[in-house]
Structure formats: C-alpha cells, structure tokens
C-alpha cells in the first residue's frame, strides 16, 4: 500500500514602514540701543599698588550712539523611520515586545565676554572658550520577543482519523502587541555677557567711564514621544478529511488565515525660545540709569499621530497556494505652532554734545593703613631683590590722598646683611602718580640711565682722543727743541767760532747778520764797513766785497837757478791763495825752517814771500817778530 500525503504550509509576511518628518524654522530679531553719559563723576577703587582712597575725579565725554542686532534662526528637522517585519512559519505564533528609549542632551552655559577701550588708548579682547557637552542616556531598554524564535504557546491541536473518520477542526488564535515609547528632551542655555569701557580723558586727571551690560538667555526644549501599538490576530482552520482505499490514500486539506493589524503612533513636540536683553542708560543730568529689557519668546508645539490596519487572508491548498491581502492604512497629522513675541525697548534720543563742568569741594582725607612691613625677596647669583610697599602722599591743587605703591630695590649680596622697609612717607605730585599708572615711570628711569651711559661713553672716547693728541704734541715739541739745541751746539763748537771768540767776537751769527743787512740797506753797510775795520773776520764769507790782493814783495837775492821756481810759486799764489786765511799762510816758515831761521818776513805780511831765500839778516828777523801779524801766523 502506497500513501502520499501533502500538508499545506501557511506563510504570513508583514512589513510596515512609517516615516515622520517635520521642520520648524523660527527666527527672532532683537535690537537694543544705549546712550553714553555726557559728564559724570567717577571714583577709582584700585587694588594694591594703585589708588586706594576715594578722590573725586571729573570726567567729560562726548555722546556715542550705537545699536546692535541679534538674529536667531533655528530650523529643526526630525525624521523617524519605523520598520517592522515579521514572518510566521508555523501554525501558532505568539510574541510581545516592549521598548522605551530616552535621549537627553544637555549644553552647559557658554559665556563670552570682551571689552573694548576706545578711541585712542588700546584694544583689549578676552574670550572664554565655549564649552558644551552632549550625553545620550538610555534610561532603560528591554525587549522580550519570541517572534524570531517562533516558539508556539497556547496552542491546541487535535487530529484523529481512521478508516472511517470524521473531520476535525483546528483553531489558531494569536495576538501581537507592540508598544514603542520614545521621549526626546533637549535643553539649550545660552548666556552672553559683554561689558565695555570707553576712556576719553581730556586732561591727565580726567577719566570718563561708561559701560554697557547685555545679557541674553535662550532656552529651547522639546520632547518627542512616540507610542506604537501593534496588535494582530488571525484565525486558521485546517480540515483533514480522510478516505481509505486499497490503492492510495489522499489527504486533502484546506486552510483559511485571517490577520488583522493595527498600528497607532503619536508625536508631540514643544519648542520654547526666549531671549532677554538688558541695556543700561545713564542720564547726564541726574546720573540715573534706565534699563531696557527686550524679551522674545517663540514656543511651538506639534503632534503627529498615525494609525494603520491590515487584514491579510491566505487560503492555501494541498496542491497550490494563493495570497490575497487586503490592507487599510490611515494616518492623522496634527500640527500646532504658537509664537509669541514680547519686546520692550527705549528708542535712542538724539542729543547734542555738551560739556559739563563739575566743581568739587575738598573732601577730608581719611587715614589709610598700609602693610609696609611685608617684604618679599628674590635673588640671583650676585643681587638680592626686595619687594615692599612704599607709602606716597600724592598732592595736587584740589586733591590730596595717600596711597601705597609697590617698590623694588636691588642690593648686592656683599653689601647687605639685613633689610627693613622704610616707614617714611614720600610726597609726590599728580604727574608722578599719572606716570606710575600708565607705566612710563620706569621707562623714564631707563631712558635716564641710558642717556647717562651714552654720555659716559662719548666723554671717554673724546677724552682718550684728546689725551693722545696732547701727548703727540708734547713729544713733537721736545724733539724739535732738542734738534735746535743740537744744531746750536755744533755751531758754537765749530772752528770759526773758536777763532772769533779769541778776537772778541764770540759768535759767527753776528757776522752773517751784518753781511745780510749790508746787502739790504746802505746805512747798515756803512756800519758793517766800520765794524770790518776792527774785525778782520767780518767779511769772511763776502767774497765779492774783497779787494785785489797786495802786490808781491820783491825777492831778496834770489839766484837764477831759483827763478823758474819763483815764477811758478807766484802763479800758484795768484790762483790759489786769494783768501785772507790762505794769504797769511806762506812758505816763509818752510823756508826759514829749511834755512834755520824764524820769522824773517818783511813788515808787510799780507803776501809773504816763499821764505826760501837765505839773504835775510838777523836784525830783519827780529823786526818781523815784533809785527802784530806774526801771532796770527803762528796760530794758523
């Protein structure tokens, strides 16, 4: 006996996709204006090292008008996609799922501050970094589902057959419930704080401050909650009639599947944006302030709900299967937005520039106590630096106050063993205090030190060069003087000077000067001739003024054999012995020595004979010895 059986299989496929999106642009515009004070009285309250009392200070400022605008544009776009797919390959399916997710984002307050000092002093800008943190916290998430595992529960199945059997029925019932709950909360807090000060001093002691305070806070929070519920139920009937035959057995079967699906979703969002700004206005007359507050609030809310239902029906058979699905989908969207704007501001008033003069009466000064005993120090390899507070009495024509200024003293380690801060008070004027405030006091000291060092260097260089020049001049003067003295000494020790000194004329310079003066004038020449009569050496170097030599005396008994020699001697005497010194030098001494006589010349000894003759008597020789020229001849 052969039997073939075919059992039908029911397959249920379900896919639902829901996409929700919405965008919400919102913008806000906020304008503010602030008037700056014309004239006001300000009081400086500095820290350590600056003004500690409260003197009145007059200030004058010109009005400044400015306005700022803030535009905030926010666009929110949210897209939610929900997709679920379930497949049933069984006759019984039971599943349940529950999930809840919470998303939270918290932004810390961010503060940015800056200050501008105008118009001619300096610009200072400081910005604190913006800090933000984002955290995603999942409160709880649980999922209990038996759909993927396709486990069967609460199922009753009964089937019986026999050769003569009756049909039995199968009832399958299933319910699926899906609940999704999601909440989204976002809170933003933005804080902006700006303070600016404008100093426009017209005199060194006049300071005009003004300030503007702006605070803006925007908060945005919205919550998205989505709840989804999915319920499905279907009915399945399996009929199994049975017939018995001798040859084959056939099990025809029929199935009917009915499914109903319902999906509902709701979405709600709330957005609240608010801006608060505050500006201050100082009145020039009463020094009062006016506060202008501008608030913009833009709350929005939206809700979206959707629902869907599906009714699939399947009727499979043993040999073929068909799928007939009937679905119905409906969705409802509800959007509600509420925007409210509240603004309150004071428009700027046009005011003409004016100048106010405030006369202040002297205020009694209060005694100030400064901790001058506190001393701190630092040191390096050679120097110790002491830091303490010095008390100053600042005096002006209308203001007097006492303040403490930090002071630094540098002392060498080898010169100090202990140090104590001075307790006396130093009196200074307002210009000193003003220089200390703007930092130019130390610059002036440095400049003075630099100028002193420069003057020292220049003076050293000039003094060195001058000293070298003076030393060179002194050495040159000494060398020239020594050269002159040496030349004069040579002239005094010469042969001519010795002869002139013996004859009553100690120097030869007088003869030189007399000969030069004789050429210049006739009177001096006559005086020179008069002096020449007494001084045989006056015309020593004046060769042109000399006359012809005297005639040669006749020879005494000269023999013929000596005639040729006498002529030659006469010619020689005429050409060579023309000078006074040469004329006095004759050969008479030679002749006398050869003949054995002494001074046997005639009375005229200017041109003496050769002295070679031997006919001179002894009486004539004695007469020549008495002549005045014999002494000069013996000297030569």
Curated annotation (Swiss-Prot):
Keywords of the record: Glycoprotein, Isopeptide bond, Membrane, Phosphoprotein, Transmembrane, Transmembrane helix, Ubl conjugation, Vacuole
Regions of compositional bias (Polar residues) in chain numbering: 1-18, 510-541
Glycosylation sites: 4, 257, 492, 557, 562, 626
Topology versus the membrane: Single-pass membrane protein
Disulfide bonds: none
Protein name (record): Topoisomerase I damage affected protein 7
Site of covalent link Glycyl lysine isopeptide (Lys-Gly) (interchain with G-Cter in ubiquitin): 512
Modified positions (Phosphoserine) in chain numbering: 628
Gene Ontology annotations for the cellular component aspect, listed alphabetically: vacuolar membrane
Transmembrane feature ranges: 457-477
Listed Low complexity bias regions: 19-32, 87-108
